[in-house]
Regions:
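Low-complexity or membrane-interfacial segments used for flexible interactions
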Residues: 1-66, 74-77, 90, 103-214
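Classical protein tyrosine phosphatase
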Residues: 68-84, 90-98
């Protein structure tokens, strides 16, 4: 990780839909640190390729069954609200734009099945403003720090990759422009909330299970 402390300048954050529509740009590579920069607070601190602060998540609640997590920009402005769906047969979360007051963007539902499967969760777009296919599947192993969000053709639109020699609290998140870095991070947060209890075998162990519970 090039830097721990962010630059003072607050970068402009493009809207979610414009990020998702920029399909000709290279992937965004982020470094995710399982720690909040705020004292006595748990969460994520996310850096861009230059070591500048890109996103943050600050969790004050220590509950293992949180109802809501907010992804913020450098200045603390809500970019996405990840909210648990009530009365769902499977563990399901909905990702909303901004402070979560109106626009649902994606649904992330935990995979449930009797047969062994590489699938951990299913992601479904909920907004026509997102130029995305009908569905994604999250596959891989959190225990190995290796998982991917794949489209119907099996192509990865986001990947969690192990970052060597820095311990388990730091990893890479690679996001393709058609999904966008904020939505990719939102999916990671939802997956973490589903699996941080450690249930479901080795493939279901949460890579980030200590993020908001250490």
């Amino acid at each position: 990780m090039a830097k721990v402390h962010p630059n003072i300048r607050v970068p402009d954050q493009p809207c979610i839909t414009s990020i998702a529509s920029q399909q000709q740009e290279p992937p965004v590579v982020l470094t995710v640190w399982r720690k909040s920069l705020l004292f006595n607070c748990h969460g994520f601190t996310v850096f861009d390729a230059n070591g500048n602060l890109a996103f943050r998540v600050d969790c004050y609640a220590s509950s293992t069954r949180r109802a809501e997590v907010v992804l913020m920009d450098v200045a603390g402005k809500p970019l996405l609200t990840i909210r648990r769906k009530r009365l769902s047969l499977a563990d399901s979360w909905v990702i909303y734009d901004g402070d979560g007051a109106t626009t649902p963007l994606l649904s992330v539902r935990r995979h449930v099945g009797l047969r062994a499967s590489k699938a951990l969760a299913h992601v479904t777009p909920l907004s026509s403003s997102l130029p995305l296919p009908d569905a994604y599947v999250v596959e891989g192993s959190y225990g190995r720090r290796s998982c991917a969000v794949r489209d119907a053709r099996g192509e990865a639109v986001a990947e969690v990759r192990r970052k060597e020699s820095v311990g388990d609290d730091v990893f890479r998140l690679v996001a393709e422009p058609r999904l966008g870095a904020p939505l990719a991070m939102g999916i990671v947060i939802a997956i973490d909330e589903m699996f941080r209890g450690g249930g479901g075998g080795s493939s279901a162990r949460s890579l980030l299970r200590r993020t908001c519970s250490d």
